[in-house]
């Protein structure tokens, strides 16, 4: 499947639970649909799913590029209860239902096109269609996407791999649950004064935090943070891991804690990039930054300095929506190919280059050693 494990979060496990605990509901259900599948059904009356999203369910096989027959059989789920699979960016055979068309005000010749899972659509919107280019999304979580032409599904590191928007292309996706959420927690817990100031000045509080972090020298006064407030996933999985501030002294101020939060996410990014390069035996030459964290120039600079790799900011901040639009444009004939559509994303990138090589090397090594030392204690 490309997934590191089969657990209770997966739709496959949830279907098994419904079958075993709500047998009457299971028996009466003709099709089980994900939310996106349901929207396609309501629009057209057709049961349809697309492959990138299906690859996140536990019932899709990356080896066969279709339903995982052995897994469905072992789970006792007949394929007939699932929708037909389509490529992302496919014009569905079924047309818009007349009542839907009337309610939404669409023309009779409006086409319905399958989209893609958020991370794969975002990678497309950022131009991430070739090996060596990586997207990182610092939202609530940190998601790192690397396009691959070949995926080692037996790799012992068990990094998540999804189907990409193109046949024969995969998206390896290391995932860390608290990145922007770490900063939000810090803001909510310790930055009441900054929140009041931002409200009075009609500014985003995150702009104020960026300014405070930028005024604080690299290294955060020797303070290190581990950003694992809800557990770690990659490169070392430990659901019991928790956040840590290490190295507090009498001269440690609020701005040092804040800077350590920014730097810890950059360290986490570098650690997972090194995992990607180790697993795939290929260099990473550029990082394209997405999500709310991409708006922070100081955070992009810290990431570039920590990793030693240029970090790019797309002119179009909503890369996921742009990727979905690219799929529709190719499907409707507006663009000849996804590669052609993605060229626009290539041109519209502002780059932040590494400055001060080696500035963070000692701190990064201490960060890695700190987690290795504390991991057995969580």
At which residue positions do the language-model features occur?
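Gly/Ser/Thr-rich active-site cleft segment
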Residues: 2-117, 183, 226-230, 258, ...
């Amino acid at each position: 499947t490309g997934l590191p494990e089969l657990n209770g979060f997966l739709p496959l496990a949830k279907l098994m639970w419904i079958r075993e605990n709500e047998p009457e509901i299971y028996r009466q259900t003709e099709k089980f649909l994900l939310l996106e599948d349901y929207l396609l059904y309501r629009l057209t009356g057709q049961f349809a799913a697309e492959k990138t999203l299906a690859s996140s369910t536990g019932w899709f096989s990356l080896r066969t590029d279709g339903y995982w027959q052995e897994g469905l059989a072992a789970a006792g789920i007949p394929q007939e209860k699932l929708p037909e699979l389509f490529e992302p960016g496919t014009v569905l055979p079924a047309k818009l239902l007349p009542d839907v068309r009337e309610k939404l005000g669409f023309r009779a010749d409006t086409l319905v096109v399958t989209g893609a899972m958020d991370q794969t659509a975002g990678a497309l919107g950022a131009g991430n269609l070739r090996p060596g280019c990586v997207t990182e999304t610092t939202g609530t979580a940190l998601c790192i996407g690397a396009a691959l032409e070949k995926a080692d599904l037996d790799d012992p590191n068990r990094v998540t791999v999804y189907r990409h928007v193109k046949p024969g292309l995969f998206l390896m996706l290391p995932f860390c649950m608290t990145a922007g959420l770490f900063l939000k927690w810090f803001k909510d817990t310790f930055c009441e004064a900054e929140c009041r100031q931002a409200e009075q000045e009609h500014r985003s509080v995150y702009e104020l935090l960026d300014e405070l972090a930028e005024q604080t020298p690299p290294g955060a006064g020797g303070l290190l943070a581990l950003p694992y407030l809800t557990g770690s996933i990659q490169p070392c999985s430990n659901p019991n891991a928790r956040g840590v501030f290490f190295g507090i002294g009498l001269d440690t101020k609020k701005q040092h804690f804040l800077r350590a939060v920014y730097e810890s996410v950059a360290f986490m990014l570098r650690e997972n990039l090194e995992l990607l390069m180790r697993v795939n035996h290929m260099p990473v030459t550029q990082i394209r930054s997405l999500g709310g964290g991409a708006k922070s120039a100081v955070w992009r600079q810290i990431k570039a300095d920590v990793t030693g790799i240029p970090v790019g900011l797309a002119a179009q901040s909503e890369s996921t929506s742009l990727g979905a639009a690219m799929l529709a444009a190719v499907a409707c004939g507006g663009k000849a190919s996804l590669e052609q559509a993605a060229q626009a994303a290539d041109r519209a990138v502002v780059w932040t280059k590494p400055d001060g090589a080696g500035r963070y090397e000692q701190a990064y090594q201490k960060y890695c050693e700190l987690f290795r030392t504390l991991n057995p204690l969580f």
